[in-house]
Structures are given as structure tokens and as C-alpha cells.
Amino acid sequence: MGIKEDNWIRKMAIEEGMIEPFADSQVKLHPETGEKLISYGLSSYGYDLRISREFKVFTNVYNSLVDPKCFTEDALISIVDDVCIIPPNSFALARSVEYFRIPRNVLTVCIGKSTYARCGLIVNVTPFEPEWEGYVTIEISNTTPLPAKVYANEGIAQVLFFEGDATCDVSYAERQGKYQKQQGITIPFV
């Protein structure tokens, strides 16, 4: 299983719609204002995805219990903004700007960007399995005792694409994975 390079990622994004919208290079400055950004777009061996303006932040207003088998949105407040302030030692869900369509012979691994990691924000994204498609639900943990700011429409994590030595027998789409074609921030369900 080998990691795929920028030329392959570009070709698959342009010809097969693997990533939409697709930034063909690392974007480090806002195209209109020139303001510095947390980079996103194509890199040497991956693609830095962006976080959208949609966030769901954990709150304890209703004294909810977090149960992955019976999750309730009472534990979350929805935010649509250019920034999201994650409270100390708290957690947020978000979604990617980009929509992904993963080929049958590819598996991805997603790693949080070092800019956020060095601020105590840990980004978790589960692998994109063969033939999975949708917007990515992104999990962000603020491990610090301070509030932390996350910027919408800027880079949040890097996606690495690995091509299998052989094609899998059953893809995510064929086994009717529960998060197939997710559109917004998708909460857990069993």
C-alpha cells in the first residue's frame, strides 16, 4: 500500500471529482485581502482540507450524558460563523468545505495540522474508506485550560491517500456504510 503524490491527487480531483472544490496548490494568503491563512490545498503527498462555517460545540446546559449508542443533540449548540471559540477542555464537531469521493482501491488517513496541534487543539478524523463519499465530519478537542479559536474556510487537517495493493472485496458503499454521502455535521448513531 503506497502513499499517493500530488500529481495523482490533482489528476483524480480534476478528472474524477475526488475533491470538490479543489485547490491546486497550497493557499497561504487570502486571495482578496492578502491576510495570512492557515494553509489549505494540495501538498506534496496529501491535501489540506478546510473547515466550514458550521460548528457544533459541546455544552452542559441540559446536563446531558454523552452516549454513542443514544446520542442527543441536547449536548450541542450550533454555530455558523467565521470563527468558533471552543471552551477550555471541551470539544467541537465541524465539517469540511470539500466534498470527497474516494476511489475503490484507496483508503485515506487524516492528520491534524501542526499549527492547531501546537496550540493544544487535537483534530481527529476517521479514515475515508474505499468508495466513501461526502463532507467530512471533523472532531476537534481543546486540551488546554483556555478558550481556543478555530478559523472557518482555512486549513484544519491533511488527508493522506493510500492506494491498496489489490482492490477490496466489499467497499464502504456496497456495505451501505451509515455515514455514506453525509451532507452536514453528522452526529454519531448506531
From Swiss-Prot:
DCTP binds at K113, S114, T115, Y116, A117, R118, Q158, Y172, K181, Q182. It catalyses: dCTP + H2O + H(+) = dUTP + NH4(+). Its EC number is 3.5.4.13. Gene3D superfamilies: 2.70.40.10. GO terms for molecular function: dCTP deaminase activity; nucleotide binding. Pfam families: DCD. Keywords: Hydrolase, Nucleotide metabolism, Nucleotide-binding. It comes from the Bacteria. Pathway: Pyrimidine metabolism; dUMP biosynthesis; dUMP from dCTP (dUTP route): step 1/2. The active site is at E139 (proton donor/acceptor). InterPro entries: dCTP_deaminase, dUTPase-like_sf, dUTPase_trimeric. GO terms for biological process: dUMP biosynthetic process; dUTP biosynthetic process; nucleobase-containing small molecule interconversion. Catalyzes the deamination of dCTP to dUTP. Homotrimer. Belongs to the dCTP deaminase family. This is dCTP deaminase. It comes from Chlamydia trachomatis serovar D (strain ATCC VR-885 / DSM 19411 / UW-3/Cx).
